[in-house]
């Protein structure tokens, strides 16, 4: 009977007597999704169950930043696609503007 096997699993040891996992094990799935939550959790020493303090500020800063500004700027310069797009757009706009100016000068002279 399946109920009996489930009951036997829970009756072997009390719920209170089971060792609870340390906070690092509990937060391991959340640490990748929410690094700022993992950074705010206190340090825990499982051998003597004592609070050892919070993480250092370097860990907190690393948890909040995903990529440095220098890396993102260098990637933009290496790729060059946005720069090429902007320069092409400026060239097209300046051509249209020159055509418009030339057209308005020609109509002003004839009038």
Curated annotation (Swiss-Prot):
Q: Domain of life here?
A: Eukaryota
Q: Show the coiled coil region(s).
A: none
Which terms under GO biological process does the entry name? terpenoid biosynthetic process
Pathway connected to this protein:
Secondary metabolite biosynthesis; terpenoid biosynthesis; Mycotoxin biosynthesis
Q: Per the record, which residues fall in region Disordered?
A: 1-24
The UniProt function text for this chain reads: Part of the gene cluster that mediates the biosynthesis of the neurotoxin verrucosidin, a methylated alpha-pyrone polyketide that inhibits oxidative phosphorylation in mitochondria and thereby causes neurological diseases. The carbon backbone of verrucosidin is synthesized by the HR-PKS verA, and further modified by the other verrucodidin cluster enzymes.
Question: What is the official name of this protein in its record?
Answer: Verrucosidin biosynthesis cluster protein U2
């Amino acid at each position: 009977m399946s109920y009996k096997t489930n009951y036997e699993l829970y009756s072997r040891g009390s719920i209170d007597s089971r060792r609870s996992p340390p906070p690092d094990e509990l937060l391991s799935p959340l640490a990748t999704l929410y690094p700022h939550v993992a950074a705010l959790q206190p340090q825990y020493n499982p051998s003597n169950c004592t609070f050892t303090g919070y993480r250092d500020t370097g860990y907190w800063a690393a948890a909040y930043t995903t990529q440095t500004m220098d890396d993102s700027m260098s990637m933009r310069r290496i790729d060059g696609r946005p720069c090429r797009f902007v320069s092409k757009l400026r060239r097209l706009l300046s051509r249209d503007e020159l055509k418009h100016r030339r057209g308005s000068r020609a109509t002003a002279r004839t009038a």
